[in-house]
């Protein structure tokens, strides 16, 4: 218990910072950063530095954890939970801590750029819209007068809004009627219903 209360996070436990990556980095980016860092601090290049071996081992451990999807998910879960214990302790306690702390985990940070799939669909939709506009602009029948003639020749031509007895008026207008319940005067039936008389 004292170890948890007196825990101070070390910089070497943040594997993303150690490798110079971000939480959203791909495995390829992580491996590329590992290669750069490993070349800088390889023990063979610095035989006089006693910490070179330790640093290189930390880099290898960070690469192994972050390049494996399952261990990376566990590491991200531990990192976002901000638990007062090392990642090794977290792994040793396995499910007991994770079960009781499922609510305390922060969510993954948002992407700064949209996904390529989403961008592609938006671009395709915009192309279709612009093509439709060009077709309408190039169409000689797209003038307002011609459009009115086409509408009058449509199946609803027998229906006129001025003639309420014409067949199909209710069908034609059903999507266009907007009721304002607050402005309507309550009927006797509604009054009885509200007063529990029905």
From Swiss-Prot:
InterPro entries in UniProt: DnaJ_domain (IPR001623), J_dom_sf (IPR036869), JDP1-like (IPR029827)
Biased composition (Basic and acidic residues): 126-156
Signal peptide boundaries: none
Keywords noted in UniProt: Acetylation, Chaperone, Cytoplasm, Phosphoprotein
Cited SMART domains: DnaJ
Highest taxon above the source species: Eukaryota
One GO location term (cellular component): cytoplasm
Span list, region Disordered: 121-183
List of residues that carry N-acetylmethionine: 1
Main localization, broad class: cytoplasm
SUPFAM superfamilies for the chain: Chaperone J-domain
Modification Phosphoserine occurs at: 160, 166, 182
Coiled-coil spans in chain: none
PROSITE patterns (alphabetical): DNAJ_2 (PS50076)
Keyword Methyltransferase in annotation: no
Domain J as annotated: residue spans: 14-79
Subcellular location: Cytoplasm
Function description: Probable co-chaperone that participates in the proper folding of biopterin-dependent aromatic amino acid hydroxylases, which include phenylalanine-4-hydroxylase (PAH), tyrosine 3-monooxygenase (TH) and peripheral and neuronal tryptophan hydroxylases (TPH1 and TPH2).
Subunit structure: Interacts with HSPA8. Interacts with TPH1. Interacts with TPH2.
Protein name: DnaJ homolog subfamily C member 12
Organism, as annotated: Rattus norvegicus (Rat)
């Amino acid at each position: 218990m004292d170890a948890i209360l007196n825990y101070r996070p070390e910089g070497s436990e943040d594997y993303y910072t150690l490798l110079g990556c971000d939480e959203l980095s791909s495995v390829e980016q992580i491996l590329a950063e590992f290669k750069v860092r490993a070349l800088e601090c390889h023990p063979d290049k610095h035989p006089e530095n006693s910490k070179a071996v330790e640093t290189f081992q930390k880099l290898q451990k960070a690469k192994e954890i972050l390049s494996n999807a399952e261990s990376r998910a566990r590491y991200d879960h531990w990192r976002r939970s901000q638990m007062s214990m090392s990642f090794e302790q977290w792994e040793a306690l396995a499910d007991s801590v994770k079960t009781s702390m499922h609510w305390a985990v922060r969510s993954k940070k948002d992407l700064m750029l949209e996904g390529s799939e989403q961008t592609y669909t938006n671009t395709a939709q915009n192309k279709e819209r612009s093509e439709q506009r060009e077709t309408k602009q190039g169409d000689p029948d797209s003038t307002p007068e011609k459009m009115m003639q086409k509408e009058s020749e449509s199946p609803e031509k027998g229906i006129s809004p001025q003639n309420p007895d014409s067949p199909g008026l209710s069908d034609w207008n059903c999507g266009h009627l907007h009721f304002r319940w607050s402005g309507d005067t309550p009927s006797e039936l509604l009054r009885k219903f509200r007063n529990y008389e029905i």
